[in-house]
């Protein structure tokens, strides 16, 4: 077991880590297809994966934590939702080309995955990406710069995509707001690519 897996297993074993659907998804459900294949990257206990499945999508959900994946499988079974949940240490070579209609990435920043995410989306597919920012004013989320977005970084990561919505709440200090200290991008992969 890796140190990362052990860390997240301990966190998820203590109980619910985040039981709310991510703001990016709750604010933009109108853009989510009611069919097709989606991927929830670093899904944790699967709140977002379950929400996508409830909207009618087929869902692949990946996370390094065996505890979180087991909790997700139990919740999916109880709710009678189909979620293909897998314990994985996510690497770029895992992403099949032109496979997904939607890829959701919340609170997990691994810049080495950007090209893989881009390639894994079908033309016209949607990326929904939300995570913490480096210039956040609130003491929330990770502190290491490797795990924090720089200003406008999301826009540059998916610069060839058509932006549907972008929000930067770095200056937001309301810890009750699900976007406090975060930024998000909803963008569509151009057709014909």
Regions found by a protein language model. Name each.
Residues 65-67:
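Conserved SAM/SAH-binding beta-strand->alpha-helix loop
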Residues 79-90:
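Conserved SAM-binding strand-loop segment of SAM-dependent methyltransferases
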Residues 95-102:
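A short acidic, Gly/Pro-enriched loop at the edge of an enzyme's catalytic core
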Residues 172-193:
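Core SAM-dependent methyltransferase catalytic element
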């Amino acid at each position: 077991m890796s140190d990362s897996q052990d860390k997240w297993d301990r966190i998820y074993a203590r109980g619910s880590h985040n039981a709310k659907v991510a703001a990016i998804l709750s604010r933009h459900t109108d853009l989510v297809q009611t069919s097709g294949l989606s991927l929830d990257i670093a899904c944790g206990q699967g709140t977002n994966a379950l929400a996508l499945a409830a909207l009618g999508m087929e869902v692949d959900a990946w996370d390094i934590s065996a505890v979180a994946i087991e909790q997700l499988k139990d919740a999916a079974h109880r709710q009678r939702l189909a979620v293909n949940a897998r314990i994985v240490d996510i690497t770029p070579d895992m992403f099949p080309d032109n496979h997904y209609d939607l890829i959701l990435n919340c609170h997990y920043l691994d810049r080495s995955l950007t090209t893989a995410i881009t390639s894994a989306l079908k033309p016209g597919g949607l990326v929904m990406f939300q995570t913490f920012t480096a210039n956040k004013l609130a003491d929330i989320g990770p502190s290491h710069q490797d795990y924090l977005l720089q200003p406008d970084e999301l826009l540059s990561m998916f610069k060839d995509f058509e932006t549907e919505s972008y929000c930067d709440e770095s200056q937001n200090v309301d810890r009750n707001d699900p976007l406090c200290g975060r930024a998000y991008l909803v963008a569509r992969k151009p057709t014909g690519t």
